[in-house]
């Protein structure tokens, strides 16, 4: 039996990366729509020091939808992926607020452990967004990102 050649694995990883791009795009579009369908959830995690809570929830929802759509097109993928990186960094304080304050935990009916689980989840999302921003990456990095993508999908489906 012959071992599978390196070119085969490269093509397989490239196809999986495309699959991950469209899947993540769908997740961001879906999350953006959820800002409108489940407004109360997102409003509850906006830190109280921020004003214009409604606008923050709706604008961030629109941004997620737009970035998800732009991720689908090769011409706009690089900018969309970096937009996702920026968005993840900007909204991270909401996850911190959810963890450190019992107010949003009680409003959403989640435990401190569930709130804590959201914090490290941002790291794979950032790495995957970076992976999607570059056309070619090393085989090892692509394998890492493939693994992180699978864990991300499992996490998304479990919440």
Predicted regions and their residues:
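Membrane-interface extramembranous regions
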Residues: 2-159
């Amino acid at each position: 039996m012959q071992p599978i050649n390196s070119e085969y694995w490269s093509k397989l990883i490239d196809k999986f990366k495309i699959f991950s791009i469209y899947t993540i795009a769908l997740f961001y579009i879906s999350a953006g729509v959820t800002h409108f369908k489940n407004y109360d959830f997102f409003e509850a995690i906006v830190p109280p020091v921020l004003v214009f809570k409604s606008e923050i929830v709706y604008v961030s929802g629109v941004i997620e939808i737009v970035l998800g759509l732009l991720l689908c097109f090769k011409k706009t993928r690089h900018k969309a992926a970096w937009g996702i990186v920026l968005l993840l960094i900007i909204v991270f304080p909401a996850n911190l607020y959810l963890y450190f304050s019992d107010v949003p935990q009680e409003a959403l009916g989640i435990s401190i452990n569930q709130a804590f689980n959201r914090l490290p989840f941002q790291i794979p999302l950032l790495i995957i967004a970076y992976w999607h921003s570059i056309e070619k990456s090393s085989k090892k990095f692509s394998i890492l990102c493939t693994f992180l993508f699978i864990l991300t999908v499992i996490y998304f489906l479990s919440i």
